[in-house]
Structure formats: C-alpha cells, structure tokens
C-alpha cells in the first residue's frame, strides 16, 4: 500500500509561592527572578499538577552548571542525537552504543525518566539505508533488526520511544514499503519493548490545519492495522514573531488546545517533545516578553488537555542550542540564557504549569 495523495498533503504541510492578590495587578513572571529561588522546580510543579514530567534534551558534556540545572529542574531527558540511526548503526549490522549508553547511564544515575529518540527518521539516516535500493522485504528486515537491537538494548529503561519521526519525509521507506511502513514499525516496536509508550513525533502540529490532521490520520492508520500507538509528540519548534524561516508566531492558547485535542481525542496521549521558541536576534526587553508570553501559552495549553502528559524543552541554555546554527539570525529560544540566567520565560512557563485549571 502506498501513501494516498491526501495523506501526503496532510503531512507535508505542591510548594507554591504565596498567593498573589488580584488587586496587586501583576503577573508572576514580571517578578524578580530572585523571588522564585525557593520555589519548586519545573518537574516538581508538573508532578504536583498530576502530570508525568518536564524534560530536556541531553547531550552529555563536562558542564557542571548545565548538569546541575537538569538535576534540579527536570525529571526527564531525551538523548539529543545519541540514539539516532547514524549514531547506533552507522554500517549495516554494526551497532555502536557508546554514546547512547552514556546518556542512559546518566539518566539512571540521576533518577530521570527517559524519552528515547528516535527509531525511524529520514534525517541522520546512514547512506547504506537511504541510498541502498533495498527491496520491500529487505528494507523491512533492516528496519526489524535495527528496532530489535536498539530497543532491545534499552528494554525496560525507556519510558517513551519516538518510533516514527516526521513520516512523510522518509522516502527510503515510503517508496518501497508504502504507508504501511508506519504501522509495521509500531508493531515491531511493541514487540521489542512492550513496556515503553510508543509515539509518533512531528513538527508544526501546533498549527491547526493539514499537518496535525495528517498526524491524526497516522494514529488511525496504525490502529487500523492492529498495531499499538500510545501517543503523539508535538515538537513545538516555534517562533515569537514572523521570521525568515517561519511566518506564523506561536498560536494562541485556544488554538494550541484545539491542536492537541485533534489527536488526544483519538484515545492517545500527547506531549510537547522538543520545545524551543526562537526569535530574530539580538533580543531586547520586548522580544523577551513575547518569549515569556509564548512559553506561558504552551504550558497552559498542555495543562488544559488532560491527556497532555509532559513537556520537553529542547535544551537548557542558549549556549548550546541548535537554533542559531540552523536558522541564521534567529535564537534566544530557551529558558536560560547563554550565561545560565533564567529568563522571564522560565517564570512564565512555571506559572503556566502551576495555575489552576478551571
């Protein structure tokens, strides 16, 4: 079975602060950051609200400040690159787990939940897969072996797995296997680690329209094949303002909620999996306030959708963010600046988690 034209179109497109009286007419995230020093961290606030985790992507490096923030603020890590296909199986049948093991060991030593990432993705895919010319049967064998080896090594240690990432762009699988490669991958993953929650993960799902509807169709497709899919990851690589690479700013809280519900209403969990909200640089006070407002909207939308189980920020500090090297002239996308100082966006995000849901 091949991708239908309509599917392709769809896819390519708590210890809280003292109460603040209403008459004070101030927003929590306008307060000096020092006033928040004794508050619970982000993950503790999320758990106090009855959800699973607040996480960050992780690249293990010798940076005490970054690691200390992760230990105190985050309950979950996502290996940023260490579990991708090119890192784990650079040559057919030759597996290298050194970096992935390091990340998994760090998580275990520090008591962190792990979102393992990612099994089947068009990018960071070795040429021996993408340019192989394998037929349908061989490609399925390759996918089966890769999933079995990688998931099997970390069986029982991954809370969530991103099984398929950005499905419509994976031409190697699509051209030979057709759209069936998606449910096939989920079926293989469920057999390799029955305890892990299995996710489809994609970008631009936060905007109402063909992309999120395409993700919903993938959920239905996997279920129609009798395979298990537990959740949809909304990457949330967003912007505060129109930029050369993204014309539409972070949606309103209401539209974010609607977008999450499009897949959550199909009986799966949802999560924000790779949050960063970039702007044109350099930043200024107004832009940083827009950043705070956007992070607040994202947090509130998750808290207002019962099946939104967690949120992962794609990095801790702007010092190491992937954004400036990928989107020229854009950046300042995270909660801590390059000097490890919390931005107003941190307080806004925390407030978005802590505020009661009406």
Swiss-Prot record:
Query: Keywords assigned by UniProt?
Result: Carbohydrate metabolism, Glycoprotein, Glycosidase, Hydrolase, Polysaccharide degradation, Secreted, Signal, Xylan degradation
Q: Quote the EC number.
A: 3.2.1.8
What is catalysed by this protein?
A: Endohydrolysis of (1->4)-beta-D-xylosidic linkages in xylans
Mention one GO biological process in which this protein takes part, according to its record.
Answer: xylan catabolic process
Q: Which GO molecular function annotations are given, in alphabetical order? A: endo-1,4-beta-xylanase activity
User: Hey, which pathway is this one from?
Assistant: Glycan degradation; xylan degradation
**Name of the protein in its database record:** Endo-1,4-beta-xylanase B
Q: Which gene encodes it?
A: XynB
């Amino acid at each position: 079975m091949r991708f239908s034209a309509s599917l392709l179109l769809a896819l390519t497109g708590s210890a809280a602060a003292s109460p603040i009286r209403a008459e004070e007419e101030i927003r929590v995230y306008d307060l000096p950051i020092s006033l928040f020093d004794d508050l619970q961290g982000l993950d503790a606030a999320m758990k106090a609200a009855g959800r699973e985790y607040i996480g960050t992507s992780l690249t293990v490096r010798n940076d005490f400040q970054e690691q200390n923030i992760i230990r105190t603020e985050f309950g979950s890590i996502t290996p940023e690159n260490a579990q991708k296909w090119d890192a784990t199986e650079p040559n057919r049948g030759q597996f290298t787990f050194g970096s992935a093991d390091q990340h998994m060991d760090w998580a275990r030593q520090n008591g962190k939940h792990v979102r393992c990432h990612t099994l089947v993705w068009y990018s960071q895919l070795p040429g021996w897969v993408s340019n192989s010319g394998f037929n349908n049967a061989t490609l399925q064998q390759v996918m089966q072996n890769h999933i079995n080896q990688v998931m099997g090594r970390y069986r029982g240690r991954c809370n969530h797995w991103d099984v398929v990432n950005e499905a419509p762009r994976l031409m190697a699988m699509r051209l030979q296997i057709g759209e069936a490669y998606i449910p096939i991958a989920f079926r293989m993953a469920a057999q390799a680690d029955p305890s892990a929650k299995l996710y489809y993960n994609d970008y631009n799902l936060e905007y109402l329209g063909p992309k999120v509807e395409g993700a919903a169709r993938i959920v239905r497709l996997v279920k129609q094949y009798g395979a298990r899919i537990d959740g949809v990851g909304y990457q949330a690589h967003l912007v505060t303002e129109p930029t050369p690479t993204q014309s539409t700013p972070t949606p309103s809280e209401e539209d974010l909620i609607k977008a999450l519900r499009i897949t959550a209403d199909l009986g799966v969990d949802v999560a924000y999996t790779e949050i960063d909200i970039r702007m044109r640089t350099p930043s200024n006070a107004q832009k940083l306030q827009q950043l705070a407002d956007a992070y607040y909207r994202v947090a509130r939308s998750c808290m207002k959708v019962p099946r939104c189980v967690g949120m992962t920020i794609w990095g801790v500090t702007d010092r190491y963010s992937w954004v400036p090297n990928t989107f020229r002239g854009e950046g300042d996308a995270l909660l801590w600046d390059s000097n490890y100082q919390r931005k107003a966006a941190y307080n806004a995000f925390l407030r978005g988690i802590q505020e009661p849901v009406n």
